[in-house]
Amino acid sequence: MPTSTLERDSGLLWHPYGPLDAGAHFSVTGADGPYVELRDASGSAHRLLDGMSSWWSVVHGYQHPVMDAALTTQIGSFSHVMFGGLTHEPAVELAERLVAVTPDGLDHVFLADSGSVSVEVALKLAVQYQLARGRDRRRFLALEGAYHGDTTGAMSVCDPVGGMHNDFAGLLATQLFLPRPPLPEASAAEVHEWLVKAENLVDAHGAEIAGIIVEPLFQGAGGMRPYHPAALQSLRRLATEIDAVLIADEIATGFGRTGSDFACRAAGITPDVMCLGKALTGGYLTLAALLCSGTVADVITTSSHRALMHGPTFMANPLACAAANASVGLLIDDETSGWAPAIGRISQALETGLAPAMRLDHVIEARVTGGIGVVELDRPVDVALTTRIASEHGVWLRPFRQHIYTMPPYISTPAVVDTITKAIVAAAAAHGDGCEFEVAS
């Protein structure tokens, strides 16, 4: 009879992107600051630095006193009410905060359950906008290498070839895709070539396109890849020319992760719709937000399609909104511990710490974008090997495909980042010729 958490988990619970019998490497027994307390199959305890910020969300670390206090206060009042026909202070305060800190013109807010759901709502919003304009446009233009979530609509705008959703191709709407945008260091000729392809595709299909959806300036789970701001700027222009809704998926990039508060602002553009998540609640509870321009909202509201047809049971959950208000306050309002000083400190430490990886023959690139550090190998990552090497160095990492990467919590000191980068370089080095691989999914 299984007794440990790991034994009881095995074959009972599915874990992300894995078979039922994959199980877990560790069970979690506690967490504080940038650390997670883990127990392995032998019962041994480990205290590891969370180099993943729990999939990029726990930016303030674990058991942050401001976050804990916000949730304790709210739960003493009420933990949940339906949002149909009712409102509450945490939701209104959060919406006001988000309108204030995001690029000008994003004046209306929809609070969703998760990042994927916010993308679903954004796609529906774009279709309703076109219907309100008297146009039956239902297709979307997206980028190869994109990742926008695992729900049905979101899957349809993820990379159609190299993505994770090939098994569901027959289920999904057929969308339009541009090649991966040029890298930030691309030549003027390479940028121009991509822009011409974008213009040609829009010229050919503009009458079908309800919206254009992008991860601004950095593609996350589709390959951990930054791209040239001219690509985003051109998509803003093309969306305007054909009156398509430009959707910026800032779920991963928002609140400073790429080195600016929002990647759209760094590129000098304002989307029609912006999706936010992950850092929004500091990883305490699931919540995402969609912000919409007054122009798009007004067109829908004054038409026969005036209701936005989406309403989750846990929409605007008060506990999640309280967490988000505390998180946004820490990220934006605190000049000493906000995102800007944190990312500046982390970025510098990542640059220094990952540089040795470039001496390895099987490393294609070691790249830093704001608070994101990535080592790309010329071969698939061995997940078990990477997990073992990283844990021996005191770090929890979760690599994928050819990438060993980190998005450290914003509370990370240079010493913490140094420990994380040493683990990444050691794990990368262990993939040298002669090793056997368990291919990452």
Residue ranges of each PLM-predicted region?
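Conserved N-terminal phosphate-binding loop of PLP-dependent enzymes in the Aspartate aminotransferase
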Residues: 1-441
